[in-house]
């Protein structure tokens, strides 16, 4: 018998050794014979007993014969090029009909795509790599593409082939990317990549560009369509595009979706497309399940809106296998976690946030990734995404791996990922986690455990260039968004534009302010007189960066206690201290972030496997604290002086910061391009002060806009009967002054009234002890 193929080629297919199975499998011309073309069709079907080719154009059936191997089939045909032919397969006495995936040779990836990706500049590579719905020659299916340049062979696994890697072997393009179109697959298909290295070892990997994954502990990717959701937030996006977020109020409620609120496991699960499957919180909390993105719309959004926050910040919602990582050990960078529902459910959640005037910020983790076998680690049998040198590629303290920022394709993966969340999910900002760990080669390393850069320094120049690139790219596509750095060192110009040498973020967490505040407020008030610099030092460097003041999740874990537990004194003083701290925070220059549970005074630390102690809201002190935060947020949003001029020296002026004996500070906040200003006076001791004089620049009646000691917040209700007139008494180098009553452990906010009608406030709202 004459064969059209040699045994060696069959051997390579049978043993998953061929880099391009299209050279062997599928339909191939054999040559012309007059007006009739001769073609050969080949197929490798490891479990087939018999195979027949079905030709739709002339309704013929041709039986295939085996060649060199009992499961390698071929047949020779004389006709015009066969298209859309099918294979009828007999196995175990059953028949099934499929389209031959090797009969579809139209690639989605162009040579230009691969070239730009190789340069690290394909900003929307997520539209090419991964799994994408396609129609080829009138047949619907899914196109798969994965970057695995050092693999010997790559196959696609799934329920559709009984997870048999011999059936859907991919072809390699330009020594970089493997691709294959599989007809008749669709949304909801579970799949993985089977990657064989040159030593013959096999790895099963989740799709790095996959849009959806199975619920942990399962790890397969799931085909998803991200283009089917109908958005309703056009007005929000247009307003964002044309505005400057740094001149707007930014008050962020940071939360972890998996521990904000749970419900009973047997409660029906609501999703965008009907009833869903419950996801148990943990083996230690078997009676509870997570709320879905869809259910959170009715629970979380009204709550945040009532409290007055402008944004929510979600601890990482990209897919991660371990709940205890809080989301910071990501395996699915392009997949919102399936714990809470589908990609469309998350789109609906963001859409509804926007329709209710709430922006959405996500925590983004480009600094490291876990070693889980199904993830990015050792992806193609080599150190592909991570540095091969553990001195540059491993965080030993965290047990994670570090991205190779100097490799174009890795950098492209991350830059495109940041863009992806803004593009496909309409998010409004990203908070980049652990920036310091990226910027320093000796981060958490002893001498001899790190490698210097090309200039002999400890700065990771590749990481710095990457951060500049990602910020430049994201801003170029989506002006008006927030890019926030959690950077805990003195690296210069973090929030400066890239064109002047900065890293390009528009905000940086002020970690120094956070540490100073918590140290100061945790000490006995009597000792605060010796530490006045703790509350004033931040203004010495405030204008070196665009700062965000954050009291985050990191401050209520690992034995640090929650905010009330940090405060000294009896219960009344603890609440008063918390109110004073947050009022000072909201009147200090800088945007604001605070973690869930602080708004009602949870006593316990945050527990990722539980939910918040909502029962505390049955008790007046916690109700009053929640009301305090609601009114503080509304004060902040309603007074341009408190937000519009945060980052210019004209926006802040000390009145007096030297009265350490009384632990009192006072200052002016001025609005941008306006004569508006507010005066803030802070008394950080339990000792009230009557007839305390404070200088002011303009005469008139100063309304007491806010008093953290008001009765409705649980305070002693000392104050100034709604406001005070100035006296022509120069004080604090100001031409006029106010004779004030300063309540204990309190902060007052005063504003010059513009007319007599504003000089009084309702009695029930006024602090009534002068």
Swiss-Prot record:
Key words of the record: Carbohydrate metabolism, Glycogen biosynthesis, Glycogen metabolism, Glycosyltransferase, Transferase
Keyword set includes Coiled coil: no
InterPro entries noted in UniProt: A-amylase/branching_C (IPR006048), Branching_enzy (IPR037439), GlgB (IPR006407), GlgB_N (IPR054169), GlgB_N_E_set_prok (IPR044143), Glyco_hydro_13_cat_dom (IPR006047), Glyco_hydro_13_N (IPR004193), Glyco_hydro_b (IPR013780)
Any single biological process term in GO: glycogen biosynthetic process
One GO molecular-function entry: 1,4-alpha-glucan branching enzyme activity
Catalytic activity: Transfers a segment of a (1->4)-alpha-D-glucan chain to a primary hydroxy group in a similar glucan chain
Membrane-spanning ranges: none
Pfam families: Alpha-amylase, Alpha-amylase_C, CBM_48, GlgB_N
Family under the similarity heading: Belongs to the glycosyl hydrolase 13 family. GlgB subfamily.
Protein name: 1,4-alpha-glucan branching enzyme GlgB
Gene: glgB
